[in-house]
């Protein structure tokens, strides 16, 4: 599986995209298996398709272990992890955590995910000097005890 970002650059992996690939190959009759292995730039991933009445209902994927060490994410920072750390983005301090789940991610909690000036703030985070390989940015709003609203740049 080759994954490309919106700007045309390569991505190592995308959990949602690989699930779509699993559904696609089953729906198109390219396989009738319910356990698939797919090669990605982040390694070989295993998928399990939950099929009922010939239709894929859900796809589960083994993403591997998350990587929290800054040098493995990568994040230009010292320490054992980069969790709940302040960074400056466009003159504002944000508390962020970073992880690699096949490609770099940066997670920050916000009061209102839909109110963000996404076209402005997204690229500023993605291309921040902290992320030498850039990063996927998740802006997470806690809606209630059971619901999160997440916008991904």
Question: Can you say where each PLM-predicted feature lies in the sequence?
Answer:
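Active-site proximal loop and beta-alpha junction motif in alpha/beta enzyme cores
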Residues: 1-13, 18-153
């Amino acid at each position: 599986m080759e994954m490309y970002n919106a700007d045309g650059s390569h991505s190592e992996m995308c959990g949602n995209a690989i699930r779509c690939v699993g559904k696609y190959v089953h729906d198109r009759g390219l396989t009738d298996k319910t356990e698939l292995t797919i090669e990605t730039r982040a390694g070989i991933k295993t998928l399990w398709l939950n099929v009922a009445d010939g239709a894929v209902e859900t796809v589960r994927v083994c993403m591997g272990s998350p990587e929290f060490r800054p040098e493995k994410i990568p994040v230009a920072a010292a320490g054992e992890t980069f969790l709940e750390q302040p960074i400056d983005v466009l003159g504002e301090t944000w508390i962020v955590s970073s992880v690699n789940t096949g490609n770099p991610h940066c997670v920050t909690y916000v009061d209102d995910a839909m109110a963000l000036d996404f076209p402005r703030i997204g690229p500023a985070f993605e291309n921040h000097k902290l992320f030498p390989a850039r990063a996927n940015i998740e802006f997470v709003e806690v809606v209630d005890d059971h619901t999160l609203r997440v916008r991904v740049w």
